[in-house]
Amino acid sequence: MSTSQSLNIIPIEYSLQTYQRSNQDTSMLHRPVVKEGEWVQAGDLLSDCASSIGGEFSIGQNILIAYLPWEGYNYEDAILISERLVYDDLYTSIHIERYDISTEKNPYGIEKITKDIVLLKDTTELNHLDKNGIAQLGAWLKEGDILVGKITPTESKKEVARYVQLYNDILGKKINYAIRDSSLRVPRGLEAKVIRVKTFPERKNETKNWENKIGLKSKALAFSVQHFLSKNQSNKKRTLSLKSKWEKETSLSSFSSLAWQKKSPLFFVFKNGIFEKLKNFPKKKKKNERVFALKKKSSKKFRFFELQKKFRFFFRNFFFFKAPKKKSPLFFFFKSETFDKERNFQKMSPNQSKQNWVKISIKKEWQKVGSFGKKKASKGKISFFPSFPQASLVGKASFFSPSRFEKKRDASNFLKSSCISSVHIYLAEKRKVQVGDKMAGRHGNKGIISQILPRQDMPYLPDGTPIDMALNPLGVPSRMNVGQIYECLLGLAGKHLGEQYRIQPFDEAFGPEASRSFVFSKLYSAKTKTGQSWLFQPTNPGKLKLFDGRTGNCFDQAITTGYSYMIKLVHLVDEKIHCLTVDHEVLTTKGWIPLNKVKTSHFVATLKKNGQLVYQNPTNIYHYPEFKGELYHIKNVNLDLLVTLNHRMYVKNGIIEATSSVDYQLIPAKDIVGQHKKYCKTAFWDKENYQFILPSVISNSIVIPEKTMNMEAWLQFFGIWIAEGWALTNTISNNNVTNFNQSSSSPYVVQISIKKKKVLEILNNVIPILGYSFNYYDNNITICDKQLWAYLRPLSLGNPYRKLPIWVWDLSQDQARVLLLAMITVFKNGTNSKWEKAASLSSRLSLASVFPEFLKKRIDKGLSYYTSSVELADDISRLALHAGWSGNNYLLKKKGSISSFDGKQIICQFDIWRISIIQSKNQPAVNHGYHSKGKEEVLPYQGAVYCLSVPNEIFYVRRNGLSVWTGNSRSSGPYSLITQQPLKGRSKHGGQRLGEMEVWAIEAYGAAFTLLELLTIKSDDVTGRLTIWDYVLYKKPLYIGTPASFKVLICELQALCLDIGIYKADKSNILKQINVSSMG
């Protein structure tokens, strides 16, 4: 049996590329297409790349498409796709991104890449890091995980006594200086896998005088040796310094054996004789005697150094030894012959000695070849250290065994975390196709994905197959390319016939109808072979009857459907996004909802142009999980927004003092950076006064009827009770009870704290108006009424999930202010305030007459409400907006925090929230120059963003508890007129390009009017020779001589299976069609 050796087969290895990063962050890889044992020869395919299959260029998918409009979602160039493309990963791509981090030096020290981060020592954030603090290969990381651990010193190191340092070293303790965690983390919205890590060591200066160096060369040799010495004159007489990690103490007898190594060119370097000329070379006998005498007299040890050839021009071995005497003559000589123990040194002629000298040459301009470290002399000892740690220092011809040196290696020779100066880490992530991605065909038909529908909602074929993509039919005449229609229909035929086609360009050379005839013939063959009659209909070729996936009804018109080759382009959605980050919240009728949880069914708070607050359903919501770009961050005490640069902000000029909403306008964030602008936090709530009716209850089989409440009194009572009241079922003893009005005893008790005088005064006035009697009990007012108790019990104090009732949102703006001010009264401190004056005034006058005056006098700056209920805190912020003011939410005390009160420690069982009510200053300004409390910056960002579109284009949003009005997330620029083409190409604000005017004309006027315009006015403008329009005006017979562009348009419309033709009436007024092919 013949083997590879008998056949003289030489194995050839090919290195395949696996998941390499491209310049556009895509992945490049090779996939083998052959197996071991297969026979291949020159020209055979061995592997495919990421963009090929079977050796052919392949970057897309053959999918089922249809040219039809669908609810406006594929308007203009928009594309509607099925969720099958997402779930089946037909357009899922792998992207590789590089993240790097480096260490820098600050005034307090040098940053360090390490795993030892004290602040995270007791957490699980460091589990996936290796000993150097770098994420391990293959680790799956998500948003916020550490890629590379790094610490930055924030204060200078303190000097520690030596005995303290010794004590800490013995016990293994480390002194923790002030450091900051500056680790590199995974950006927002990213979940990826670590596939490659590159570390770079620190680059230390290898010589003190890096600029002044000289080179050592040998002219007689075919190679050259380059190392560096100081150029200063004072250093010329110093010993040549070379360093090596590998050094061995050896005697002179060991050194003498070097002469007998085979093929080892030798250099002997002595001291103090580099520039001296060798005049009298010793004779054979004297030389022998001198050398052996030196050998016998010496008992000291010498150093032997050896460096394997690193570069192609380096010699194999370099030897150096230092003579035992301080003033030994130095000689350079080279001998290429092989010596043995018997052979003595030969006397060299002057020419030979001159040629074999290694001379030192000083060059002003030289190129750096290699660096061999700096001089290190200690007590007359010289060592040699190369700057290439991976270089082997032992050659095969050396008598030193490599294993002897390998035993001396330890962990210190390898890369330590303290030596790492920078790290490049590569993450691989999968990106599925999403809304906003750009797709294109092979004929210039590109577009943006606008919606992803469930496959059951997509239109489907007569056999039940749902389509994968819906394209706008108006994109065909605008592209001026009929090839996409032919490809679509031919793909449908090839799918059912199992065939592939290669169409030669310019196939019209075979006939004027070559493409059309070939496509129709293949469709007919598919119909005959499969028995599916719907594949080809002679009366309407190329069109199919499709059914609506939502209703099952058939569409009125037949639709062009087939298979086409569609490509997903590089992700370009980032530049067209008008979005906010996920940490924003939106105000709805359901309360404050995170931006990523808002649905089109929610009613979002929006602002009209006149400043009126209304609630509307969002028209659309967009989510882009892989946004990568810059964000605009603006923050001060009343404002906090983090948006994309294209997001429109609702602002006005800072110099305008008026509070009218007319002056506000929507401006992109990138256009207001650094400018003095004012934002808006308030709105006008246009509601009629609301009348509250207390629901009826059943008590002891008796129905207590509904009760209509006095609204002014009820709002103040309810506002105080929601802050300081609770419902009890205990029976209160008669002790410590003072009867204010006699009332029947009842176990259903409503109790309100009256520790503050102003609260007591208000309750004394409003409770009798409401028709209740009350008692005093331990600094509390108690009301015994089952009907009131039953309604107020779910809203009792101490319930962490309580919220305002629904009827509150039907209050008018004045009523909302009364309720809000009553709630804040409980937390208002001070005496003789405007509130107390208003309360005392209301005790003397009727509440209805004092009510407007009460609102005017209660304007105060420091108004706050405190609660442990998150829902209630959000409701109060919304109530402030209904009142024409605004509210900022702050987390005052976190759950579990400890506070001291009267010498006792109190542990918070819930989060304590403070809502700051702002009544007057609701136009926060930025970049006004008065103080530097605000912050404005443009930050790099990668992660998820959300886009919200509302009809009024302005909605209410908050971040970190600070609410403000902001602009619509997505906008379309002004539309250009149909008959107007912008100069200098495409307009930046939505203008059409040449060829798109016909599309708009067809859509607006209809095909007949458009053809009339093109046939008359346009044709005259283009050619300047036709007189059709004059003939129409003067009612003369028309002469058909249309331009070539009109013929192209007619052909494309016919390719869409539209019945296009020119008809002429004969003498009998019978229309007869004119052959288009004979025109022009």
Curated annotation (Swiss-Prot):
- Enumerate the catalysed reactions: RNA(n) + a ribonucleoside 5'-triphosphate = RNA(n+1) + diphosphate
| A single cellular component GO annotation | chloroplast
Pfam hit, one = RNA_pol_Rpb2_7
DNA damage among the record's keywords? no
Enzyme Commission number: 2.7.7.6
Which biological process terms from the Gene Ontology are attached to this UniProt entry?
Answer: DNA-templated transcription
Report the top EC class in one word: transferase
The task this protein performs is described as: DNA-dependent RNA polymerase catalyzes the transcription of DNA into RNA using the four ribonucleoside triphosphates as substrates.
Q: Which PANTHER family match?
A: DNA-DIRECTED RNA POLYMERASE I SUBUNIT 2 (PTHR20856)
Assembly and partners are described as: In plastids the minimal PEP RNA polymerase catalytic core is composed of four subunits: alpha, beta, beta', and beta''. When a (nuclear-encoded) sigma factor is associated with the core the holoenzyme is formed, which can initiate transcription.
Tell me its family: Belongs to the RNA polymerase beta chain family.
**Any idea what this protein is called?**
DNA-directed RNA polymerase subunit beta C-terminal section
- Tell me the organism: Stigeoclonium helveticum (Green alga)
- Give the lineage: Eukaryota, Viridiplantae, Chlorophyta, core chlorophytes, Chlorophyceae
